[in-house]
Amino acid sequence: MSGGVDSSLAAALLVEQGYDVTAVYMKNWTLDLPGMKCPWADDLADAKRVAVKLGIDFKVFDFQNEYKYKVVDYMIDEYKYGRTPNPDIMCNQEVKFKLFLETALSDGADMIATGHYARVGNGVWEMGNREEQKIPPISQSLIPNPQLLMAIDEKKDQTYFLYRITGEALGKTLFPIGGFTKPQVRRMASERGLSTATKKDSQGICFIGQVGIRDFLSQYIDVKPGEIKDSKSGKVLGRHDGAFFYTLGQRHGMELGGGLPYYVVGKDMSKNEVYVTTDLNDANLWKNSINLSDMHWINDAPKNGEYQIRVRHQAPLVDAILTIEENGLTLKPDNPIRSITPGQSVVIYDKDVCLGGGIVS
């Protein structure tokens, strides 16, 4: 239980279904950095308040060391090398659905539940229904080859962040709010008198809170100013405060003037240079083919064929031809896709079933 409305309602629904529920707050990050306050103490208090309201046990699992090593250090290293990682995906893979799951099971739990906007199914039943909440008994939930399904609320769907969890972990997981929209979740939380019903959603880095990525990285990576150049002429257009801050397709934060928007089309980490253009049709901004490595499949790997892909959270699903190769796979979307950058995840779907995905090479 994170202290937000989603996990609060998830716990309440499980209690109403007759589950023996224990609320667990994961203490993953408590460090206050200069000018940045981590909200963990407030979140902990909110989670505990809801647990008391529901009359359920409350525990704290301290994963700070593991989180720093598995998530934060990974994120920092990726940015150092000029890639664009997603720490929320790594947090789900290494902490929530691995370390937390293992700890909960060893502590006597049969399953875990989270407040993610996602659903679980196997083609026969699915957990979560827009008309009424249907949460299967444990015996039904521990199923072979469980499928990760998109949430009913497409705007809040979080399967993009969940694509690297295992089928085994998914079979021991419940997503009680996946069948509801966000407005429904807030209304239902309010009807149950949960103090988090109107709490704003977290917008910061996973578990770190309202901290901008630039401010956070500046605490761990030496900032080295460098040149911003026109990608075609090589003309120096301005200065930047660290090439690792910039990602392909980025438009804001350069203050180059001239009245035209500039887009990042490349960077050279060895030279600490960022390359930009005013041409939105620049070939470096668009991909007709996407190469993925470090593949992960929730169940079996799909066969070659046409699927749907999502290149970032809340991006629309687009059709693409998938071809499995020896060291990864290639995706060829129906139309070129803008701003595909090394290090980001591309997630593959078969309609509303999340199959898995990989990292852009």
Task: Write out the residue ranges for each language-model feature.
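ATP-dependent adenylation/nucleotidyltransferase module used to activate substrates
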Residues: 1-128, 134-135, 141-163, 174
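AMP-forming adenylation/ATP pyrophosphatase catalytic core
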Residues: 31, 113-120, 147-361
